[in-house]
Amino acid sequence: LADTHIRLLHDYLDSHECFPTVAIEGGVCYFRWDKDCIDKCKFISHSNGVVNVTERYLSENSSGIVIRDAGSLSILEKTKSEDNFSKLVSPRNLFKVEIEKLREQEKENGIKVFGRYNRGRGNQFLDNYITKDIRAERFLGKWKVFVSKADGAAGQLGNPIPARIIGKAELGDPFTICTETFLAVGPFNSRQETVNVMKYFTTKFFRFLVGVRKLK
């Protein structure tokens, strides 16, 4: 992304515009690299017959990805001054649950473990849970939101049908952790605060921000 020798880039969100008989998820792009030129890239986006041309650096707004939709850049620029929501999102496999120790019946003072079991979402149980991971400890005894680490659409969004941007969020009470299938968002001090975050997940603005990263 930091290469300023890429002088021209054509980006096709729908691969069929280049290869009518081939479906390539995420689309197709090609570019011209010029060793004698150090400047902005002429970025030409092709989408549903509409061509949009901008002059910009590929690393525009320091997001770590190429923002394919030029119209999104100004919106993203306005969010820079706000705290990044990703600070609330746990790393993968935060709790490092030992699956072989799970049981289907709940034991008094046990710990619920939210995950996917028998092709569906649900809870199983641990007799106890101890961790030395400071990141995991922060979530113990606190409210949190569970969201699938791999869900929703990827690549080309909204074509041919509106894409599911992110999977359904689940409320996690202070006595519940999750398997590696899910990420934990939080921690939060109250149920109401957690519910508010779940509502934020459903807003068009949040879906837009996540969608921009998926459309990379």
Q: Each PLM stretch: what is its role?
A:
Residues 15-216:
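C-terminal substrate-recognition regions of SAM-dependent nucleic acid methyltransferases
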Residues 5-17:
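Conserved S-adenosyl-L-methionine
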Residues 4-5, 38:
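Conserved small helical "lid"/interfacial subdomain of P-loop NTPases
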